[in-house]
Amino acid sequence: MGIFDKIKDKVSSAVKSTVDSVVKTTSEVFQFERLRDGLTKTRNSFVNKLRATIGLGRKIDEKLLEEIEEILITSDIGFATTERIINSVRNTVKRENYENADRIYELIKQEILAIFAEIPAPSQEDVYKLNNVEKPFVMMMIGVNGVGKTTTIGKLAHNFKKFDNKVLIGAADTFRAAANEQLDVWAKRADVEIIQQKQGADPAAVVYDTLAAGIARKSDVILIDTAGRLHNKANLMKELEKINRVMKKHKESAPDEVFLVLDATTGQNAVQQAREFSKVAPITGIVLTKLDGTAKGGVIIGITAELKIPVRFIGVGEKIDDLQLFDPIAFTEALFDLPDEVEVTNE
């Protein structure tokens, strides 16, 4: 290879690296904008009220802290988490001798970040590129009917497919009418394969066939749907135990992840659902859907603080690309992101 060929190769490599970097940056900016848009209702209910209450030049006193406490509670952050945030703010104010209320805005933001930091968030690379995992990687979705399990599976399948993974869906919700049809539509949209049987079939049999097919077809990731029947915990527990047993006949570590899907619009009811489901299944992560349709997005903070279960994915819209890997820093920045014309001072 001549000197000019070497120079040309170096230039081409540099250009490709620059283009890849720009594409990645553009994608991240787009995702942040979608996240910010999706949190509009929560931001209007929580952050804008907080900003208005703090006001310019207002002094810090117990009356102000009580007003802020009420805002946090009504934003579905939860009593225990609100108490933690307020106590942290109160202690910092006392220790640092803060007087101007403008300081509180940043203190609350930092305490929320501290709550999220207690549970490390995996990187996009690790999640979607399935780094350091045994394949097929098996993810099981649980949750009551209507929270968006089917949609979540379809969007997750799409996300994994974008990273060149071979995806297989198992339609093990054989009790709900039209569940198979809906999941089949999403499988087609994501352009992935699906294993299903007729309505009323044994869910464990569907799971068994799905794992067998996934191993035979060398699938990278398997997504399992399940029925949502929390009102009958005894039957649900038996069903999940049976599903777990048949999975382990194919792969000892399966399921590798158990994701509980929750509807953000239900607010504190979502926290209660998480508590109940944790009694019947080893939940490894939360998927919080419909954040764009509610002012109750603060529930994500309470779930993290009180249940110590990591939020792994969030739904910020109806489009197939609107299921995002949860990034606590991006979430907090988007939540507190104010219009350019609004200035919050931190003296």
Model-derived features: where do they sit?
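Non-catalytic terminal/linker segments enriched in charged/polar, low-complexity residues
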Residues: 1-140, 162, 167-168, 338-347
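P-loop/Walker A NTP-binding module and the surrounding RecA-like catalytic core of P-loop NTPases
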Residues: 80, 110-347
